[in-house]
A protein has these predicted regions:
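Acetyl-CoA-dependent GNAT
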Residues: 25, 52-110, 121-122, 127, ...
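A short beta-loop-alpha structural element at the N-terminal edge
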Residues: 22-34
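Conserved GNAT-fold acetyl-CoA-binding loop/helix
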Residues: 35-62
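Conserved GNAT acetyl-CoA-binding A-motif
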Residues: 128-140
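Conserved acetyl-CoA-binding loop-helix of GNAT-fold acetyltransferases
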Residues: 113-126, 145-153
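C-terminal "cap" of GNAT-fold acetyltransferases
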Residues: 101, 164-186
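Conserved catalytic-core motifs of GNAT/GCN5-like acyltransferases
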Residues: 87-90, 137-140, 152, 157-174
Length: 186
């Protein structure tokens, strides 16, 4: 994927216009910003089951598992700052699932509620057929209503529900599995 400039109008109909936004393949130099965004999500306790902050060194193997040709990791860059990221990764490594990818989307606290998650997710849906992906899935905590609404607005359905499967700070949390089939024209 080459860098793609986003339309410099209001993103998702919210907030001020954002000039200079591009979505591009992540490079290793982006890893500190990616980790910073992820660690903020860990502290928020709403979007990941990871409980302890991670280091750049700990995330390096995960970073290197991504490839622009099959399981990309994209960053959303605004005026030289990483505002968010989206990753594709194997859903299940058995051969029959190779056409299914799990996606994760994280947006910096500073850039939330501007529609960046939607822009990243729309790009993932549109690009999936080029990656020979015919289904996308996501795992979202049941109490993460903003993410559930976002995915549902973009055609994802609730494909699974695992009640009280995660324990976060002594609170049992439900996990919702959302999914969407990708048409060849996506």
């Amino acid at each position: 994927m080459t860098a793609v400039a986003a339309n410099p109008t209001k993103i998702g109909g919210h907030g001020p216009p954002l000039q200079g936004m591009i979505i591009r393949d992540a490079v290793e130099a982006d890893l500190p910003a990616i980790v910073e965004i992820y660690n903020a999500a860990i502290r928020g306790r709403i979007s990941t089951a990871q409980l302890d902050p991670v280091s750049i060194d700990e995330r390096l193997p995960w970073f290197r598992e991504h490839s622009p040709e099959s399981h990309p990791l994209w960053v959303d860059e605004i005026d030289g700052q990483i505002a968010g990221w989206l990753s594709f990764h194997s859903f299940i490594t058995r051969c029959a699932y190779r056409g299914t990818a799990e996606i994760s989307v994280y947006v910096s606290e500073k850039f939330r509620r501007l529609g960046l998650g939607r822009v990243l997710l729309e790009k993932a849906i549109a690009h999936s057929s080029h990656l020979e992906i015919n289904a996308l899935v996501g795992r979202i905590f049941g109490h993460n209503e903003p993410s559930l609404r976002l995915f549902e607005r973009l055609g994802f359905e609730r494909w699974g529900f695992l009640p009280r499967i995660a324990r976060v700070d002594d609170v049992e949390r439900d996990l919702v599995i959302v999914g969407r089939h990708i048409s060849a024209q996506a």
